[in-house]
């Protein structure tokens, strides 16, 4: 075991301590426990070549962390896909020869429900115990023959944070086969940027506010950080006095604008992704006035807008009625262990679809001239939804977590 742990002030509480970790994974490491505060999590140490879906966790306070990971092995050829927390993609499937090592650095945001000693986010039962809301920073590597040789973790106070607010089309979905663009967009940002995905399935702009989720974002936000909001899917289902696109929804969006700007943040809207609802080969509008209401508020308040609504329409229509299912959770019974019934969902993306929408999102930001796009990775390329990636060549290794229950807000 080769671990270095430096505490800037041993007498300070954990939340105030600066920590640096260096783990040599070519040597024995323990199973995770609260007592050790680090180790292999959920699965045993990867003693056998070919073992896939390995987790390693470190107990750390809330904040951003600069993480450097070396993949590969001196003993064998490897194929590794690297993810963080709840399946946030960091490194796509990467094949390396025996003795070939490759090092990557990125910045990962870790958070808990706590805002202050007395205030916390009102997370739901499904979120409790998830990797996005616990007291650990977790890395996950999978593949045909994955290997990680070294992990270095240090607090980071310099990265720009991009906070995501939204619903099930944005959230870090905890379980396969569900996925959202928020957990794929991490693939395209360098270590100068951390993505903090605060979205949750079933939320409206109003419930996001009522559950103290924006309070949590603002507690972490520093001047110059970004807040990206995608709402509309669930807002259109609200009933009661004031419900509708042009009153409650517009009013709630204005609250986001005012509060983020008051805190020194930069706010961006993105219109809701389309549902797969075809008629005569064309996607039909299912969101009513909500995309237009978001655009109207954005024009009035000078908020940049990424048009995911338009881009996903083109994407679905390009794939066509049948192949568009390949981007969503459409799987016959028996595709996954324990899956006893067919999954057919025309709202929620699978990893391929989420990856494509993440490419749309980064392209939209780039086209708007948003300054944070200067930190896109060197292999990033602009995306045209009229020419999507081939779903047959997309590689994703399922995690050990599977759920056949549709996300809230379907």
Question: Could you describe each region identified by the protein language model?
Answer:
Residues 4-15:
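Sec-dependent N-terminal signal peptides
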Residues 19-51, 145-152, 168-171:
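Low-complexity, Gly/Ser/Thr/Pro- and Asn/Asp-enriched, turn/coil-prone segments
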Residues 48-63:
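Short beta-strands within extracellular/lumenal beta-sheet-rich domains
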Residues 56-57, 71-92:
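Short, surface-exposed beta-strand/strand-loop-strand elements in extracellular ectodomains
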Residues 63-69:
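A short tyrosine-centered beta-strand micro-motif
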């Amino acid at each position: 075991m080769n671990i270095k742990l430096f505490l800037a002030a041993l007498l300070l509480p954990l939340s105030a301590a600066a920590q640096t970790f260096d783990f040599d994974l070519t040597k024995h490491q323990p199973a995770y426990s609260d007592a050790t505060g680090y180790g292999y999590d959920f699965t045993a140490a990867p003693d056998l070549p070919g073992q896939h879906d390995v987790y390693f966790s470190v107990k750390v306070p809330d904040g951003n962390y600069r993480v450097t990971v070396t993949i590969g092995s001196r003993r064998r050829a490897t194929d590794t896909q690297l993810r963080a927390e709840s399946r946030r993609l960091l490194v796509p499937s990467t094949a390396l020869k025996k003795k070939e090592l490759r090092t990557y650095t990125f910045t990962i945001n870790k958070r808990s429900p706590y805002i202050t000693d007395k205030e916390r986010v009102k997370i739901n039962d499904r979120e409790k115990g998830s990797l996005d809301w616990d007291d650990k920073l977790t890395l996950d590597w999978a593949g045909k023959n994955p290997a990680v040789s070294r992990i270095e973790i240090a607090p980071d106070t310099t990265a720009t944070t991009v906070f995501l607010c939204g619903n099930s089309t944005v959230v870090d979905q905890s379980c396969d086969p569900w996925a959202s663009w928020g957990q794929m967009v991490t693939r395209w940002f360098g270590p100068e940027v951390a993505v903090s995905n605060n979205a949750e399935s079933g939320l409206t702009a109003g419930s996001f506010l009522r559950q103290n989720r924006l309070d949590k974002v603002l507690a972490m936000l520093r001047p110059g950080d970004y807040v990206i909001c995608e709402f509309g899917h669930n807002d259109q289902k609200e009933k009661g006095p004031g419900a509708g696109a042009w009153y409650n929804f517009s009013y709630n969006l204005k609250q986001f604008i005012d509060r983020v700007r008051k805190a020194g943040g930069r706010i961006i809207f993105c219109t809701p992704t389309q549902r797969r609802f075809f008629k005569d080969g064309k996607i039909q509008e299912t969101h009513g006035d909500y995309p237009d209401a978001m655009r109207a508020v954005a024009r009035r308040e000078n908020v940049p807008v990424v048009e995911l609504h338009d881009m996903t329409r083109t994407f679905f229509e390009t794939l066509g009625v049948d192949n568009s299912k390949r981007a969503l959770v459409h799987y016959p019974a028996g595709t996954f262990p324990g899956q006893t019934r067919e999954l057919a969902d025309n709202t929620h993306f699978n990893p391929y679809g989420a990856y494509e929408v993440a490419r749309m999102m980064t392209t939209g930001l780039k086209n708007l001239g948003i300054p944070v796009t200067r930190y896109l990775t060197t292999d990033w390329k602009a995306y045209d939804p009229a020419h999507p990636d081939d779903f047959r060549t997309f590689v994703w290794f399922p995690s050990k977590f599977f759920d056949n229950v549709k996300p809230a807000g379907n």
